[in-house]
């Protein structure tokens, strides 16, 4: 019988600078939003509001919204979670299954509930204190994924809660909310000496290989777009940007993309340093092909899980 959660690693051997390029791209571009826009609507539990919001912010939502990975990474979609739970003599705890989970279409602000796996019942979130009939503890809260714009349109779609209470509590806390996009990487990725390794968690209730492919496809597209948009200044080197002096053949490296690409073509560069290098050796299309081949190799390795 397969365990509901398994830790695995996906390993591929690549040219070291290409492996580093993919690792750095993954860490900088593959950003899964946290639930940092949280509003407590009612709380008579022994945990204070800040404790609830901190715990909810870091709920591992990718294993719940796995059908929407690509659109969440491109920020076409966001999501929210909602909890309304009262203590009873029979049920004295809260699990992740007690939440309702909704996907948000950012074009229309439509809010759609998604199915939740029954396995979430095994993930304990909170235990109430001893039950007393006359002082039953309750908690009601809602949390949106980072980057969600809270406006009248989206609030009108929250038909499962008291909008008046929501507006009051949201107005009380919105000035102290972090306006920045807050996220985490879905996996830890390392690349020592070209050994690109993804440390992943595989769950029994969905097709991890399909989800991993969505992530790698997103990463490949984002990296190729960044390569096409990347520029190296030609002329005198001024140590503010990566630049190349064709007269002296000196290259100043000041960003990770330049460093990894020129190293792929034989330069032994480091950040914020000068190197004598023939820039004509760089073939961008050849590098992109190597990147695409590497992504195929990564997906092939993931299929062996």
From Swiss-Prot:
One of its GO terms (cellular component) is DNA-directed RNA polymerase complex. Its main location: virion. GO terms for molecular function: DNA binding; DNA-directed RNA polymerase activity. It catalyses: RNA(n) + a ribonucleoside 5'-triphosphate = RNA(n+1) + diphosphate. Its EC number is 2.7.7.6. GO terms for biological process: viral transcription. The keyword Transferase applies. Belongs to the poxviridae DNA-directed RNA polymerase 35 kDa subunit family. Part of the DNA-dependent RNA polymerase which catalyzes the transcription of viral DNA into RNA using the four ribonucleoside triphosphates as substrates. Responsible for the transcription of early, intermediate and late genes. DNA-dependent RNA polymerase associates with the early transcription factor (ETF), itself composed of D6 and A7, thereby allowing the early genes transcription. Late transcription, and probably also intermediate transcription, require newly synthesized RNA polymerase. The DNA-dependent RNA polymerase used for intermediate and late genes expression consists of eight subunits 147 kDa, 133 kDa, 35 kDa, 30 kDa, 22 kDa, 19 kDa, 18 kDa and 7 kDa totalling more than 500 kDa in mass. The same holoenzyme, with the addition of the transcription-specificity factor RAP94, is used for early gene expression. This is DNA-directed RNA polymerase 35 kDa subunit. The lineage of its organism: Viruses, Varidnaviria, Bamfordvirae, Nucleocytoviricota, Pokkesviricetes. The gene is OPG156.
């Amino acid at each position: 019988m397969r365990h509901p959660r398994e830790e695995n690693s996906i390993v591929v051997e690549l040219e070291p600078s290409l492996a580093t390029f993919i690792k750095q791209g993954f860490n900088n571009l593959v950003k899964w939003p946290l639930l940092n826009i949280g509003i407590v609507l009612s709380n008579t539990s022994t945990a204070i509001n800040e404790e609830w919001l901190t715990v909810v912010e870091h709920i591992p939502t990718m294993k719940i919204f796995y059908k929407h990975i690509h659109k969440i990474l491109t920020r076409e979609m966001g999501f929210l979670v909602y909890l309304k739970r009262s203590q009873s003599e029979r049920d004295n705890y809260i699990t992740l299954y007690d939440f309702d989970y909704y996907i948000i279409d950012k074009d229309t602000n439509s809010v759609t509930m998604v199915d939740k796996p029954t396995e979430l019942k095994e993930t304990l979130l909170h235990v109430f204190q001893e039950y007393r009939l006359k002082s039953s503890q309750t908690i009601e809260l809602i949390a949106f994924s980072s980057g969600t714009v809270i406006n009248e349109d989206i609030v009108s779609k929250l038909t499962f809660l008291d909008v008046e209470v929501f507006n009051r509590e949201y107005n009380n806390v919105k000035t102290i909310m972090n306006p920045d996009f807050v996220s985490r990487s879905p996996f830890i990725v390392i690349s020592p000496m070209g050994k690109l390794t993804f440390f992943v968690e595989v769950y029994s209730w969905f097709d991890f290989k399909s989800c991993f492919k969505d992530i790698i496809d997103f990463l490949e597209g984002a990296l190729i777009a960044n390569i096409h948009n990347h520029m190296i200044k030609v002329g005198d080197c001024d140590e503010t940007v990566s630049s190349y002096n064709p007269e002296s053949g000196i290259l100043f490296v000041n960003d990770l993309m330049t460093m990894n690409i020129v190293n792929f073509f034989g330069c032994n560069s480091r950040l914020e340093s000068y190197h004598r290098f023939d820039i004509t050796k760089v073939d961008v299309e050849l590098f992109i092909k190597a990147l695409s081949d590497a992504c195929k190799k990564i997906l092939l390795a993931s299929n062996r899980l």
